[in-house]
């Protein structure tokens, strides 16, 4: 009997070691995907801030990978751009060479997006066929792949909003596009964190997990508000801090009717709400840090709480600097990068309260 138990124990240990090797491979893969997604969001931000998003007026999922290669092809691409309101109303004096500078941002954004589809789908297929993906993770990963495909349609849906009447894309569709990118990012982060070893430190308080969830969700909401700010060019509405045009609450926040539409279409109101959201997020991470340091100092949870507070503080400082300098490109991109770092860490922090995925073994499955 003892020999049988020893054999069973050895078999389980062998399976666990094998799963640990597979998990390391999956973490490396998902980490690379996260890095690519981070770059994609930054290039997307640059595309928006340089007003390049409408430079490619057709959706060519396959042969759109190849850019114009001759003067005639550039002339044809430029001719298509000349048909839309953005050129006719804002850029009518633009030359082909000037057009190229905005074309390359949008082309790079689409190319990276296609590349991410490849570096996600092909390894997923390989890991699946070779049995390296645990059963519990198969369909969640397929779900992320499906969200990626949907994101491609959302991207074109966003671009199409600026091709007929508007001179820019809809801020609603822009926000949807960015939030979807963040959800895909969060899904990859959640699974990668679950595949990583966790400490055995107890949670600081009963409310810690709920507070971690609230911080992650609110960070995503702040990103949504930031997308509205970008879509409406609301960063140029008030370029003072901490007051807005000399007041704590400006007088022209509710000038549009019905009043609720101001929260989505009045640039000044949108910036005001984004500021309030930043203060709220700062308060949440401060409360989270104080609770962790008081109830569970020197634990992994406390260290994460301190780091999260530091990240939000730096991000707030970058936001203020970007505002005061009237949104220069590099600072705007730094602010967007900071938002994704804060959100990614908030998701990882939240996932940290659930522990590592239990190992799957044939013994456990039979039991």
UniProtKB/Swiss-Prot annotation:
Complexes and interactors: Interacts with CtaB.
Species of origin: Rhizobium etli (strain ATCC 51251 / DSM 11541 / JCM 21823 / NBRC 15573 / CFN 42)
Species lineage: Bacteria, Pseudomonadati, Pseudomonadota, Alphaproteobacteria, Hyphomicrobiales
EC number, as in UniProt: 1.17.99.9
Reaction(s) catalysed by this chain's protein: Fe(II)-heme o + 2 A + H2O = Fe(II)-heme a + 2 AH2
Bilayer topology annotation: Multi-pass membrane protein
GO biological process, one term: heme A biosynthetic process
Cofactor(s) of this protein: heme b
One GO location term (cellular component): plasma membrane
InterPro entries in alphabetical order: COX15/CtaA_fam, HemeA_Synthase_type2
Pathway: Porphyrin-containing compound metabolism; heme A biosynthesis; heme A from heme O: step 1/1
Function: Catalyzes the conversion of heme O to heme A by two successive hydroxylations of the methyl group at C8. The first hydroxylation forms heme I, the second hydroxylation results in an unstable dihydroxymethyl group, which spontaneously dehydrates, resulting in the formyl group of heme A.
Transmembrane feature ranges: 25-45, 111-131, 139-159, 174-194, 210-230, 272-292, 305-325, 327-347
Residue runs in coiled coils: none
Origin: domain of life: Bacteria
UniProt protein name: Heme A synthase
């Amino acid at each position: 009997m003892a020999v049988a138990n020893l054999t069973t124990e050895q078999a389980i240990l062998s399976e666990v070691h094998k799963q640990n090797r597979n998990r390391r491979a999956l973490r490396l893969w998902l980490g690379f995907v996260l890095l690519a997604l981070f770059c994609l969001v930054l290039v997307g931000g640059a595309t928006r801030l340089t007003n390049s998003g409408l430079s490619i007026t057709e959706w060519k999922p396959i042969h759109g990978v190849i850019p114009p290669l001759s003067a005639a092809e550039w002339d044809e691409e430029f001719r298509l751009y000349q048909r839309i309101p953005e050129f006719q109303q804002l850029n009518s004096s633009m030359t082909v060479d000037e057009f190229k500078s905005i074309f390359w941002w949008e082309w790079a954004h689409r190319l990276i997006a296609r590349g991410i589809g490849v570096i996600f789908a092909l390894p997923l297929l390989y890991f699946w066929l070779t049995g390296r993906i645990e059963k519990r993770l198969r369909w969640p990963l397929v779900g992320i792949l499906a969200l990626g495909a949907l994101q491609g349609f959302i991207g074109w849906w966003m671009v199409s909003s600026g091709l007929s009447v508007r001179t820019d894309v809809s801020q609603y569709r822009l926000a949807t596009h960015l939030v979807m990118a963040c959800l895909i990012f969060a899904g990859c982060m959640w699974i990668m964190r679950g595949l990583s070893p966790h400490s055995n430190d107890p949670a600081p308080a009963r409310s810690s997990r709920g507070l971690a969830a609230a911080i992650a969700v609110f960070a995503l909401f702040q990103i949504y508000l930031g997308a509205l700010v970008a879509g409406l060019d609301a960063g140029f509405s008030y370029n003072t801090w901490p007051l807005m045009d000399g007041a704590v609450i400006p007088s022209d926040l509710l000038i549009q009717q019905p009043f609720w539409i101001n929260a989505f279409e009045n640039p000044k109101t949108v910036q005001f709400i984004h500021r309030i959201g930043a203060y709220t997020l700062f308060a949440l991470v401060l409360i989270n840090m104080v609770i962790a340091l008081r109830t569970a100092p020197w634990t992994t949870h406390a260290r994460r709480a301190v780091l999260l507070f530091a990240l939000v503080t730096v991000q707030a400082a970058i936001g203020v600097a970007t505002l005061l300098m009237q949104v220069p490109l590099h600072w705007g991109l730094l602010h967007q990068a900071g938002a994704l770092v804060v959100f990614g860490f908030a998701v990882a922090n939240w996932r940290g309260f659930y522990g590592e995925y239990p190992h799957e073994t044939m013994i456990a499955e039979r039991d």
